[in-house]
Amino acid sequence: MAIQGYAEGIQAGVMDTGSAAEVILEESDRMTELVEELLDISKIDMGRQLLAFSEMDIRELLYDSIRAVEPTVVSGGIAIVPDFPEEPIMVKCDDMQMRRAVTNILSNGVRYARSELRLTCRADKRHVTIRIQDDGDGIAEVDLPHIFDRFYMGKSGKSGIGLALTREIIHLHKGTIRARNGDTGAVFEISIPVSR
């Protein structure tokens, strides 16, 4: 485990304290996030995940999600290109949980994009579809059927909890989520009911 190795390096006096502390803090944040995701998925399994639904313009939530990943976007040299209609798209959702789901997919997209991430939003009379597409290498075909499975790590080596939790959040909103490969990169599509 990286935290233990860096802490032992500091203790033995063989590592630079500042850079080792930075790695320890980053890994601690990652572990905290993983524990929170595991707790939330456990609450969903037990039927204890209470959602606070309110009506809102989904475009505002999407802009908030873009702002949440902005530091990573800037440091990685990635551009997020939003494409939303001018008129409001009203949905009933748990603002915090839905933002978490969208931000998770955006964060993944930023990680795998080469230069650009497209975020589009379209609505018909019944549903709003949110599409997030990166310009990376896409998802390995062997991983696609399992991308939302709990603990499935695939070639990325990540914990396999984030996308599973995202799917559960979308399902709690009576929506669907799917992943596929587009002409360039991975495409994630979320569909949830509109409220009016």
For each of these PLM feature ranges, what is it?
Residues 139-151:
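Short conserved segment of the HATPase_c
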Residues 46-51, 90-93:
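Conserved micro-motifs of the catalytic ATP-binding
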Residues 54-55, 74, 79-89:
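Conserved catalytic submotifs in the C-terminal HATPase_c
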Residues 26-31:
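Short alpha-helical segment of the dimerization/phosphotransfer core of two-component systems
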Residues 116-126:
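Short beta-strand/loop element within the Bergerat-fold HATPase_c
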Residues 52-70, 81:
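A conserved beta-strand-to-alpha-helix junction within the catalytic ATP-binding
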